[in-house]
Amino acid sequence: MDQNSAANRLTSFGTQLLEVHIWLREMLEDLRDSIDAYFNGNGLPPRDLRAHCLSFCTALTRHHTGEDRGAFPTIAEDFPDLRKVLSDLRADHNQLDWLLGNLQNLLESLPEKPDPTTASKVREEVTALSAIMQTHFIYEEKQLISVLNSMDVPEWHENRPDFLQIDDEDGYR
């Protein structure tokens, strides 16, 4: 393998993390748009909206579970000074899981016809989820992109770990 190829491999993990975060941000924005369309009376029926939410929630949960079980232990081993950062990120994951559960519960009880009370509750939950997720991603990117770019984990090259997977037409999953 030439040096350029090796260098690209070494910088790819941080770049891949950023790509996953961009994708998850886009998924959340698309879900928010679908929720707004539903409450404005011209969106998906509740069943389809719940399926849309489930897709986003599953992707975010898979990403964070992959970090907690795979990436963070590897980073902690190689960079022990980041253990507090990783602990903070895990705490965010727990908070995001709780918010995802709240959103899913609200969407499970959506009426067939939108109503203002439900709209307010759902929009508040999406706003809270978005705020925590954005803050979490920015913090994680500032703390871990350069670290990930400095790492060479052969098994991550051979089998893309869950925290770096994207479900799309490019075949990332």
Label the predicted regions.
Residues 1-173:
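Small-residue-biased structural context
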